[in-house]
Amino acid sequence: MIEIIPAIDIIDGKCVRLSQGDYDSKKVYNENPVEVAKEFEANGVRRLHVVDLDGAASHHVVNYRVLEQIAVRTSLVIDFGGGVKSDEDLKIAFESGAQMVTGGSIAVKDPELFCHWLEIYGSEKIILGADVKEHKIAVNGWKDESACELFPFLENYIDKGIRKVICTDISCDGMLSGPSIDLYKEMLAKFPDLYLMASGGVSKMDDIVALDEAGVPGVNFGKALYEGHITLQDLRIFL
């Protein structure tokens, strides 16, 4: 059964969502992300995806205090991403309570460092973030497109030991337009042992059911919850 992993995106210490990674589209949903996390946990959620959007924009971890508060005040298993660009950033994330850390831009820009982290911490703790636009990997909080093609990028890191990947189709993210099921099917056909977390486009329960039926192991989503298109009660069939 697919694993439900709600997302809390943070700007200025607040729970927000963007559309297609556009910071100008920011919408604040809650001033207190800890309260959001506690509500998730109270309804049976066990995993949480926390994104430091300030960190992604400024190239170093910024909102670690929020991560720390969520980790202290809930028992959620947290994966954290956004602005993790150095050994110090990674240390801050783990010391602040993340059980897993997602690296996206760093895996493109400094593969040697990312592979070092993978060797030191292992594939249970290091997640590869593959943010995709038309099969190309995007970096720097999705503002820039790299020359990396999705499938060679994945293959390279899977060969180096990566087992967990969060793949976001940027064209879908925050748009409530439905996830890229065909893309995820293609990825799982090529890499059947991958623990793939689909991200972007989830707008209704049918989308989660479709991802589950496609064999996708995990799903990250936020806006559909915050906008009320999916309720925590709806999700209980998967929790």
Model-derived features: positions:
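Conserved, mostly hydrophobic/aromatic
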Residues: 9, 40, 48, 93, ...
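Conserved anion-binding
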Residues: 12-15, 20-24, 98-173
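Catalytic cores of alpha/beta
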Residues: 74, 78-100, 182-221
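Alpha-helix-loop-beta-strand connector modules within alpha/beta enzyme cores
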Residues: 57-79, 115-131, 176-204
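N-terminal beta-alpha supersecondary unit
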Residues: 15-61
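Glycine-rich, proline-tolerant flexible connector loops at the mouths of alpha/beta enzymes
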Residues: 47-65, 105, 167-177
